[in-house]
Amino acid sequence: MSKGHSLQDPYLNVLRKERVPVSIYLVNGIKLQGQVESFDQFVVLLKNTVSQMVYKHAISTVVPSRAVRVPLLNEAGGAEGEEDEQAE
């Protein structure tokens, strides 16, 4: 995992695993709502009544509906290795 993704991937992974409803604001101001179904280096799959593939470069802000705890990289069972669990 590159340094640029050391927070992004664990954060999205917690949102995905805990099925936290999120609001995603795009750079053009559009608000999307749903749950993070999956993600990779370039896109986030957002599920609501339909699944939408949203390109990360178009995302301005991700707002969860509740507080989430992101594991630190040095914690046991932390973000390292959880990347493989994205396709549930």
Swiss-Prot record:
GO terms for molecular function: RNA binding. Residues 9-68 form the Sm domain. SUPFAM superfamilies: Sm-like ribonucleoproteins. The keyword RNA-binding applies. One of its GO terms (cellular component) is cytosol. GO terms for biological process: regulation of DNA-templated transcription; regulation of RNA stability; regulation of translation, ncRNA-mediated. Keywords: RNA-binding, Stress response. Homohexamer. PANTHER family: RNA-BINDING PROTEIN HFQ. HAMAP family: Hfq. RNA chaperone that binds small regulatory RNA (sRNAs) and mRNAs to facilitate mRNA translational regulation in response to envelope stress, environmental stress and changes in metabolite concentrations. Also binds with high specificity to tRNAs. Belongs to the Hfq family. This is RNA-binding protein Hfq. The gene is hfq.
